[in-house]
């Protein structure tokens, strides 16, 4: 491991220290390594041809104009990417779904875009993890 020196604005350093404390990092280096790994993983997973895993989470109103049916149709259209899906009833109107996906990251991103862009889907988030050798 190599030691490097970086220069940060006071505000950015304070934000880093607050993040480090909230997440329980022992030092700034651990926090910066995790932030950098996350940025590099996200960058590498945005390309077709990169295999990996992803977690897609989103909230939707289950009774909104065929939305549940459209989401299921999209899931079946991309069935080869789906490893597992967790469905949670948040309240009378809203559902949370969490899908674990595996495959070409370009295809995974396309699937996530198809789901998240549906009218009535809120809080859509895709977390990608490149396949490690």
UniProtKB/Swiss-Prot annotation:
GO terms for biological process: response to nickel cation. The keyword Cell membrane does not apply. The keyword Transcription regulation applies. GO terms for molecular function: DNA-binding transcription factor activity; nickel cation binding; sequence-specific DNA binding. Ni(2+) binds at residues 76, 87, 89, 95. Binds 1 nickel ion per subunit. Keywords: DNA-binding, Metal-binding, Nickel, Repressor, Transcription, Transcription regulation. NCBIfam families: nikR, PRK02967.1, PRK04460.1. Homotetramer. Transcriptional repressor of the nikABCDE operon. Is active in the presence of excessive concentrations of intracellular nickel. Belongs to the transcriptional regulatory CopG/NikR family. This is Nickel-responsive regulator. It comes from Escherichia fergusonii (strain ATCC 35469 / DSM 13698 / CCUG 18766 / IAM 14443 / JCM 21226 / LMG 7866 / NBRC 102419 / NCTC 12128 / CDC 0568-73). The lineage of its organism: Bacteria, Pseudomonadati, Pseudomonadota, Gammaproteobacteria, Enterobacterales.
């Amino acid at each position: 491991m190599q030691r490097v020196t970086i220069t940060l604005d006071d505000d950015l350093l304070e934000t880093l220290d607050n993040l480090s404390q909230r997440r329980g990092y022992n030092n700034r280096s651990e926090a910066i390594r995790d932030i950098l790994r996350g940025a590099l993983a996200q960058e590498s997973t945005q390309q077709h041809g990169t295999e990996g895993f992803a977690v897609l989470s989103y909230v939707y109103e289950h009774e909104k104009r065929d939305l549940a049916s459209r989401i299921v149709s999209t899931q079946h259209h991309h069935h080869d990417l789906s490893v597992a899906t967790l469905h949670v009833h948040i309240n009378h109107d809203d559902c949370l779904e969490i899908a674990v996906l595996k495959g070409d990251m370009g295809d995974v991103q396309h699937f996530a875009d198809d789901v998240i862009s549906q009218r009535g889907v809120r809080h859509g988030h895709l977390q990608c993890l490149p396949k490690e050798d």
